Amino acid sequence: MSSEFSGSRLRLYALCGVIAPVFFTVMVIVEGFLVTGYSHMTQQMSDLGAYSLYGSYALLQNLNFFVSGILMIMFAFGLRRGLPGSRVIATSLGLFGFMFFLLGVFPDEPIPWPAAAHYLISWVGGVSLLVSVFFAWRRFRRPVAGEGVGWIMYGRFSLVILVLMVVSFVVLAIFGQPGSPIRGLVQRVSETPFLVWIEVMALGLLRLSKV
């Protein structure tokens, strides 16, 4: 950790990463029960942000994208400052957070242009996160002088998450097509690995901030 970057500030950025996945998940669950006719089983999470479908309720999901995206960007900044050699990891994660934020700017409306922009942003975000997880595995797969062996488990964990993410993308492409009776379920399962990865990495940074 940089001597110029205090533990309290690093802790704040780490907490942003801890909060982001939990906040996003809880908001989606609550919104799904608030919106009449919405199904977690058959519908995507982004459907909740469509104003043409759910009116003012859609604002909740788009605010969810905004807040979660900002929290992820702040966590990425803390990761960059707190862990030497994590530039690519943090930059890719920050890009993912920015794409997450943009999902709220371009809701998944049931008309061609906004929907196309929404899905393009989603794919860019997904690829950037894959890059972040890949380089996390590379960065932490063997001990670095001065860091001990504690971060090796994060490298192994990142490799597991990387494999799960690739498998999830394939499963989503096959079983998450429009009209699928389990489209919503498949999306939620496929997004679980990256949310867990962010949570675990943030907890690791939080632990580092207390050293």
Give the ranges of each region predicted by the language model.
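C-terminal ends of transmembrane alpha-helices
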Residues: 26-27, 33-36, 40, 98-112, ...
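Internal transmembrane alpha-helix with an interfacial aromatic "cap," most often the third helix
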Residues: 66-91, 133-144, 202, 208
